[in-house]
């Protein structure tokens, strides 16, 4: 048996079914090209018979993708197969994926047919699809709840009809690993022509078992896993591609199989899918979550500084990240503070570690996470100055033209004791507020992340805006709270402006410090 596991991505078909709004053809093509760079073997990109838009997107992707095999879904109906074949005909290599329900509840309640009739439809669909390509995949929908005798008969008949891949879906995420592995094992034991097809699995996450079930299936002989980027999909989602890829890579010593995935593209592809699908990734998501390579415990941080593999079983670089994060919080020890200062280029004679650590703990207790620029400010500025706000937003007035989409914002800001009033227009109220604040502070920043949330519940909830901005090639993080979203955005912007102002003062101090050294001063 081959030790190569085929990665069948269905982000653009099953994954898209979870979205509140459909992706455009251009967005689907962007994702398809990213999946090709990632190295997926097969990408299922739509259901052509379902709509003209889906047909167009499948055809566009089929015409563009060269290295991955492009696949389209069809029911066990000739009109579906015709549409799939027509949309895929421009591809260099393609697959038709046809399916029918096989569980008793689906056969009787949904299809309202006998199992024998369904078996006949399945065989007919596979034979018809083979007229267009020799790469036909057949799926037994709801295989996880299908009586095993019926499942064995269906699989044998589909292979005999010409299916090269047989997919065994846990459509409703019902099975547990021991049970699902037993199904795969039984198929290998009882289906006489099983060696003439690749066994595939397609697991859903309703009980949180999709990845575990897929791995168990591989251990029992499955050699294709159907999955989606970030695990998006119907209901609770699908088996997560990034988790599967990294499990098989990290535990190759146990599982003895490999994929063709270029793992260094995982982070970039995950972010693209998250942004285009408007589905944020939870921070604690395995592999691609913001906290996946972040360490906050002082004990863990100490271990990481001594040997990275004490608390990391894979490296952030392996998925395309630059490095891990040692979050500086009140749980961090002196060694972490010393390490961060040294990484920023300071020697021990530049700062008093004991005094700095005491100030750090005071700030961390108030603020939570402390960033590098906070640490520098504590080291080189008086504590009071490090926390002062040079810019203070006193008033914000916004007017919007609903017909033109242009907004005007007027701000009154205290700039180091001097009151400044500025007005500006923008593409919407937040953009206008930013332009007005930039005028008043005479500072320009590039916003690279904008997140809107809420603090509190019901009518008492406050809008919370978190932004990340770049200033002089350094990232700064601002937070704003207000009952109004635009005001919260403005406060977050002013917060960042204050941080950049403080950073400039620290830079001046450092420059003077270096000059004094060169002159032989203290």
UniProtKB/Swiss-Prot annotation:
Q: Which cofactor does it need?
A: Mn(2+)
Pathway this chain belongs to: Amino-acid biosynthesis; L-leucine biosynthesis; L-leucine from 3-methyl-2-oxobutanoate: step 1/4
Where does the protein end up? Cytoplasm
Q: Which GO terms describe its molecular function?
A: 2-isopropylmalate synthase activity; acetyl-CoA C-acetyltransferase activity; manganese ion binding
Q: Which reaction does it catalyse?
A: 3-methyl-2-oxobutanoate + acetyl-CoA + H2O = (2S)-2-isopropylmalate + CoA + H(+)
Q: Which UniProt keywords apply?
A: Amino-acid biosynthesis, Branched-chain amino acid biosynthesis, Cytoplasm, Leucine biosynthesis, Manganese, Metal-binding, Transferase
This enzyme's EC code(s): 2.3.3.13
Please name the top-level EC class of this enzyme. transferase
Any GO BP: L-leucine biosynthetic process
Which residues are listed for Mn(2+) binding in this entry? 14, 202, 204, 238
Pyruvate carboxyltransferase domain sequence ranges:
5-267
Gene Ontology CC: one annotated term: cytosol
Q: Does the keyword Transmembrane helix apply?
A: no
Question: Which SMART domains does this UniProt record tie to the protein?
Answer: LeuA_dimer (SM00917)
In terms of Pfam families, this protein maps to: HCS_D2, HMGL-like, LeuA_dimer
Q: InterPro entries from the xrefs?
A: 2-IPM_HCS-like, 2-isopropylmalate_synth_dimer, AIPM/Hcit_synth_CS, Aldolase_TIM, LeuA/HCS_post-cat, LeuA_allosteric_dom_sf, LeuA_bact_synth, PYR_CT
Q: Which domain of life is it from?
A: Bacteria
Chain intervals for the UniProt region annotation (Regulatory domain): 392-522
Subunit info? Homodimer.
| Family under the similarity heading | Belongs to the alpha-IPM synthase/homocitrate synthase family. LeuA type 1 subfamily.
Which PANTHER family does the UniProt entry name for this protein? Answer: 2-ISOPROPYLMALATE SYNTHASE 1, CHLOROPLASTIC-RELATED, HOMOCITRATE SYNTHASE-RELATED
Q: What does this protein do?
A: Catalyzes the condensation of the acetyl group of acetyl-CoA with 3-methyl-2-oxobutanoate (2-ketoisovalerate) to form 3-carboxy-3-hydroxy-4-methylpentanoate (2-isopropylmalate).
What this protein is called in its record is: 2-isopropylmalate synthase
């Amino acid at each position: 048996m081959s030790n190569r596991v085929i990665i069948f991505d269905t982000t653009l078909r099953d994954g898209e079914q979870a979205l509140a709004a459909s992706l455009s053809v251009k967005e689907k093509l962007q994702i398809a090209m990213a999946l090709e760079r990632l190295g997926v073997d097969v990408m299922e990109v739509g259901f052509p018979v379902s709509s003209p838009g889906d047909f167009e997107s499948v055809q566009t992707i089929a015409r563009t993708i060269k290295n991955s095999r492009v696949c389209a879904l069809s029911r066990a109906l000739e009109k579906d197969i015709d549409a799939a074949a027509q949309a895929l005909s421009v591809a260099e290599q393609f697959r038709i994926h046809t399916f029918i329900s096989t569980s008793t509840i689906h056969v009787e309640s949904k299809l309202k047919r006998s199992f024998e009739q369904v078996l006949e439809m399945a065989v007919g669909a596979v034979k018809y699809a083979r007229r267009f390509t020799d790469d036909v995949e057949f799926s037994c929908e709801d295989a996880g709840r299908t009586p095993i005798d019926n499942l064995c008969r269906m699989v044998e008949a589909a292979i005999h009809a010409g299916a090269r891949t047989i997919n065994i879906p846990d459509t409703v995420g019902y099975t547990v690993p021991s049970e699902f592995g037993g199904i795969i094992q039984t198929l290998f034991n009882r289906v006489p022509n099983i060696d003439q097809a690749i066994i595939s699995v397609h697991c859903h996450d309703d009980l949180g078992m999709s990845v575990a079930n897929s791995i168990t299936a591989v251990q029992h002989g499955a050699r294709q896993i159907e999955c989606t980027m970030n695990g998006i999909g119907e209901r609770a989602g699908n088996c997560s591609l990034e988790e599967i890829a990294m499990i098989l890579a990290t535990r190759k010593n146990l599982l003895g199989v490999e994929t063709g995935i270029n793992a260094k593209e995982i982070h970039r592809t995950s972010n693209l899918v998250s942004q285009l699908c408007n589905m944020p990734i939870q921070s604690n998501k395995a592999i691609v979550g913001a906290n996946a390579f972040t360490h906050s415990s002082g004990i863990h941080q100490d271990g990481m500084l001594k040997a990275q593999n004490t608390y990391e079983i894979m490296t952030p670089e392996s998925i395309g990240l630059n490095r891990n994060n040692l979050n500086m919080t009140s749980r961090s020890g002196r060694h972490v503070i010393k390490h961060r200062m040294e990484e920023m280029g300071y020697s021990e004679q530049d700062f008093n570690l004991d005094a700095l650590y005491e100030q750090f703990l005071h700030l961390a207790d108030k603020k939570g996470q402390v960033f590098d620029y906070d640490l520098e400010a504590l080291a080189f500025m008086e504590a009071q100055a490090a926390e002062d706000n040079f810019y203070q937003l006193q008033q914000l007035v916004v007017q919007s033209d609903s017909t033109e989409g242009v907004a005007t914002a007027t701000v009154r800001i205290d700039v180091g004791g001097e009151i400044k009033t500025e007005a500006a227009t923008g593409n919407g109220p937040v953009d206008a507020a930013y332009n007005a604040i930039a005028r008043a502070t005479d500072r320009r920043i590039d916003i690279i992340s904008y997140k809107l949330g809420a603090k509190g519940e019901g009518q008492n909830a406050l809008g919370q805006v978190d932004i990340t901005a770049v200033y002089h090639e350094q990232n700064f993080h601002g937070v704003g709270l207000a009952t109004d979203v635009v005001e919260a955005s403005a406060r977050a912007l002013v917060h960042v402006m204050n941080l950049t102002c403080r950073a400039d003062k620290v830079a001046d101090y450092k420059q003077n410090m270096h000059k004094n050294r060169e002159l032989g001063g203290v």
